[in-house]
Every structure is written in structure tokens, then in C-alpha cells.
């Protein structure tokens, strides 16, 4: 998902997106722990997406 698409979403949609990313990160971490994860770069990509969504949530709330 590109940055502009994320910026167009409201706070509720960003929270839903964040929840999905946390689930994806959890699944990837479990695969890595069990030795089944072949594409380890996906962990970093998901972590960066989480940071991007959290940044947008902070910008939207103005805290």
C-alpha cells in the first residue's frame, strides 16, 4: 500500500490496517522461530509499514 492511500484513510481504517499488520508480523515471527521463513526481509518490510501507519495515526490525532 502506498503512502497516499494510507493518508486518505481515516483513523478507524488506520487502526484496522495496523491490527492486520500486527497479525502479519506475528505470523512471520512464528515462522522465523520455527525455521520455516525463507524470506526474512518480509519482517523488516512489515515493521516499516507498522511504523508508517503509527506515524500517520500520531499526525491525525495531533498529539
UniProtKB/Swiss-Prot annotation:
Pfam families membership: Ribosomal_L29
One biological process term in Gene Ontology: translation
The UniProt record lists the keyword Ribonucleoprotein: yes
Cellular component terms per the entry's GO annotation: cytosolic large ribosomal subunit
Ranges annotated as spanning the membrane: none
UniProt keyword annotations, A-Z: Ribonucleoprotein, Ribosomal protein
Keyword Flavoprotein part of the UniProt annotation: no
Gene Ontology MF: a single term: structural constituent of ribosome
NCBIfam families found in the cross-reference section: L29
Protein family (similarity comment): Belongs to the universal ribosomal protein uL29 family.
Name of this protein: Large ribosomal subunit protein uL29
Organism whose genome encodes this protein: Baumannia cicadellinicola subsp. Homalodisca coagulata
Lineage of the organism: Bacteria, Pseudomonadati, Pseudomonadota, Gammaproteobacteria, Candidatus Palibaumannia
